[in-house]
Amino acid sequence: MGRSSLASRRLIALFLSALTLLMTQPAASAPTARFGLPFADPPGPDTWLLGQPYGNTVGAFARRRDWYRAGQGVHFGVDFSAPCGTPVVAIGDGVVLKVDAREHGSGPHNLLIAHPNGYVSLYGHLMERPLLVVGQPVRRGEMVGRVGDPDLTCTSRPHLHLEIRDRGLRRAFNPHLLIDADWEALMLVGPFGRGFQRDLDNPRRWQSVWDQPDVRFGGPLINDFRDPWPRDWRR
């Protein structure tokens, strides 16, 4: 009886130890955030707000055949609405890779920073050419530019367009998974709609900021749905 009770206690102890170990291990499908936000100030109506999130947004679906065609039809970055001139900071340590690289869009000015973890961050729609040179090291939180307006008015739609790409610049990744921020709170307010386009043949796919596809630039459209919702008014 005593030996049986001791064996039972040992089994329970082993089970609890294993359970504790499993609970303290990070989930394999949940990558650790590697970067910070591109602003030093906290969000607010006088500083910045989340605009359009990354992914299969309703807005990107509507322009999938023109604005977003090169990115397989989805919004391949995150838009942060902010007044023109708002300082933009580097989201991580790195080295300046490109300045005003027109082949990557996001005019009137842009900046690309290569990070030691293999990612490249792109800062688009900057107000002026960044005062940086290729090869210059930058630190996380260092000012690297100022928010501009792609329409050159500063009253139309001033915002920062931020992308996270691979070193070859051929793939874009979901920044919501890589930037340490309270995205749940940031999604509550802002100037753009929060909806993601729904494929009624697979209605649960790509319906949150956490579940969005990587982009392969130049690849085929991935959201040209047969039965979309909201309906495609252009058809």
Task: Give the ranges of each region predicted by the language model.
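Short amphipathic beta-strand/extended segments with alternating polar/hydrophobic composition
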Residues: 51-52, 58, 62-64, 123-126, ...
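Short alpha-helix capping/helix-loop boundary micro-motifs
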Residues: 82, 129-132
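Bacterial N-terminal signal peptides
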Residues: 13-22
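Zn2+-dependent peptidoglycan hydrolase active-site motif and core
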Residues: 91-130, 157-161
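Conserved, short, structured surface segments that act as functional micro-motifs
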Residues: 111-115, 136-206
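Surface-exposed, glycine-biased beta-strand/turn segments
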Residues: 24-109, 140, 188-235
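Bacterial N-terminal signal peptides that target proteins for export
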Residues: 3-12
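Glycine-centered loop/turn positions within well-structured domains
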Residues: 86, 121, 145
